[in-house]
A protein has these predicted regions:
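Bacterial N-terminal signal peptides that target proteins for export
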Residues: 1-11
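Active-site- and interface-proximal helix/loop "cap" or "latch" segments in soluble metabolic
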Residues: 47-338
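Intrinsically disordered, low-complexity segments enriched in glycine/proline and serine/threonine
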Residues: 6, 27, 275-278
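Low-complexity, Pro/Thr/Ser/Glu-rich flexible segments characteristic
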Residues: 29-47
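Composition-driven recognition of long, C-terminal low-complexity regions enriched in serine/threonine
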Residues: 27-28, 204
Length: 338
């Protein structure tokens, strides 16, 4: 996604958030008019008090000659009863793929995210702040606390996607436009799922190689794919899960027999695909993927990390809610709680 496309998406999301906010205000006024005054006030207070959990994923794929890159940014957010950011956690996965003139594909050997790599992602060495990726990403996340989704969506960056605000630059000099967009998307997706005041947002990612072949031929291209499982959680003071959202993305670069690499224009997650994912007809439960995901998330609520580690896809109660393979989603949830 180039800078122009990203800017257009940010403007569209800001407009959508503003329209959503206006729509909610008007809907509340209409409801009050059709009820007694005390009943309408009580309903409005209940809606306002709901704390919301959100997950946003922004995936960009680029190509150049015989090389390509997939960059996936994810944000877990917790919105307070006034709709302002209370807790934010960010992470990013970067996957580089190359090919030679015979169509042979070279894939990464390390599928960890930037946060998971820690000191193995050597940003601090070249940073003017001498800070690593996690420190700078957390500084950006902390800067957003107390903002509304609209304020986040309108955060200004320079032509390289880097912050322009002096206060933010004192703790973060990396490009943040993709993280801003992920947070904005997470806010737009946020729902009341059980989180409450005092909870904290958590985020976990499990990425695995989804590529079956490594050499393209005249008859068959290679889809250099990474399968990414993402789980956003909120936890209480006892580190028990109070809400959860689980999603997956399968971005892929196409490699042809002469080594040329082509990136997709758009990558949607399974939650974003919704009914278009097309799983319902093949599901023993008659459920679409997002409904299986909701069943898995329901099974996480109230549990600690140790209890989640003991979950089994073969458990009868879980199978009644979810029959998809939970292996990588479970690992992502455990990563969020580590």
């Amino acid at each position: 996604m180039n800078q122009n496309h990203r800017a257009l998406w940010s403007c569209a999301m800001a407009a959508a958030l503003l329209l959503t906010a206006c729509g909610k205000t008007n809907a509340g006024s209409g409801s009050s008019g059709s009820m007694s005054g005390s009943s309408g006030t009580s309903s409005a207070q209940t809606q306002t008090a709901a704390w919301k959990t959100g997950l946003g994923v922004v995936t960009e794929a680029t190509d150049q000659d015989r090389a390509g890159k997939i960059e996936l940014a994810a944000a877990a957010v917790l919105l307070d009863g006034e709709g302002k950011l209370e807790s934010v956690l960010l992470d990013e996965l970067e996957v580089s793929v190359s090919a030679d003139s015979t169509g042979h594909v070279t894939l990464p050997t390390d599928w960890r995210t930037k946060r998971q790599k820690g000191d193995d992602y050597p940003l601090a060495e070249v940073s003017s702040l001498k800070k690593g990726w996690a420190e700078q990403a957390d500084a950006f996340a902390n800067y957003l606390i107390g903002m509304t989704p609209e304020q986040v969506s309108m955060l200004k960056v320079d032509k390289d996607g880097k912050p322009t605000d002096a206060d933010l630059l004192s703790g973060c000099t990396i490009a943040v436009d993709r993280y801003r967009d992920a947070v904005t998307r997470a806010c737009a997706n946020a729902r009341a799922l059980g989180a409450a005041k005092g909870d904290r947002a958590a985020l976990g990612i499990e990425a695995v190689n989804g590529t079956s072949d490594i050499t393209a031929t005249d008859d068959k291209d290679v889809n250099a794919q990474v399968d990414v499982s993402i789980v956003a959680l909120t936890t209480d003071a006892d580190r028990r899960v109070t809400s959860a959202i689980a999603d997956m993305a399968e971005p892929a670069l196409t490699v042809v027999s002469d080594g040329g690499v082509t990136a997709p224009d758009l990558v949607k997650t399974k939650l974003e695909l919704g009914e278009d994912y097309g799983m319902r007809g093949a599901s023993a439960l008659g459920k679409e993927w997002y409904e299986h995901s909701e069943g898995f998330c329901d099974a996480l609520k109230g549990k600690t990390r140790t209890e989640i580690a003991g979950l089994s896809g073969g458990d009868a109660d879980l199978k009644a809610l979810c029959t998809i393979d939970i292996t990588d989603l479970q690992k992502a949830a455990l990563d969020a709680l580590s």
